[in-house]
Amino acid sequence: YIDDYMFLTERLENVFPENRNVKLEVFLMLYCEEGEVKLELNNVARHLQANDLLISLPNTIIGQVMASPNHKVKVFCFSNRFIQRLTQTQKYSWKSICYIQENPIKHFGENRNETFHQYLKLIEGKIQTSPDKYQKEILLHIASAFYGEMVAETTRKSIEKEKQGYHTPVKQPDFIFKQFMEALTADN
């Protein structure tokens, strides 16, 4: 499925050309249902196994993608426009973005996995119905809720790390970007 806000596929080669690095201009979520996927995210090796979700922010370089023969994945790409639309209304998203950048892989335990699969079923079910004038809007709302769940979970994780005394130093480009996003949000 593809529209101007999102792209969904079950094939890695639809997103990652063989033996090439790709700089993605989208917010990517790669869910490994079965098997294993290995890749480099900004030249850092990452390894996904069953029930792992990789979250990649825009402008991330992804390369060296390899998958086991029995792999089964779902790839979600959200446009920058869609993510900007969502983050304008969410004040807590900055901490989540910082946490995602440091911890791009999330393993779903049994209870969180069920919630994630409910969203997958909703999205896939709506895609498979015959298109009508409301399909795109409904998909956007489901994707917004899905994104909200993911941000809520990562926000909880980042707050837990802060309480444990872990603090990521703020880098100047991050600080400037945060100020820019706050200015954009205030300029509605």
Predicted regions, residues:
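Generic protein-terminus/edge-of-domain signal
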Residues: 1-49
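Short beta-strand His + acidic residue motifs that chelate non-heme Fe in jelly-roll/DSBH
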Residues: 39-40, 62-68
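Short loop/turn positions at the edges of beta-strands in beta-sheet-rich folds
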Residues: 31-33, 58, 68-70
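Short, Lys/Arg-enriched, Trp-marked, Pro/Gly-tolerant hinge/linker segments that flank
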Residues: 108, 130-138, 150-187
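A hydrophobic/aromatic-rich effector-binding and dimerization subdomain
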Residues: 1, 65-129, 154-157
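Conserved metal-binding segment of the jelly-roll/cupin
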Residues: 48-61, 77
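Hydrophobic alpha-helical core bundles mediating ligand binding, dimerization, or RNAP-core interactions
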Residues: 116, 120-123, 143-150, 180, ...
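Amphipathic alpha-helix face/heptad-repeat signature
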Residues: 112, 119, 135, 139-142
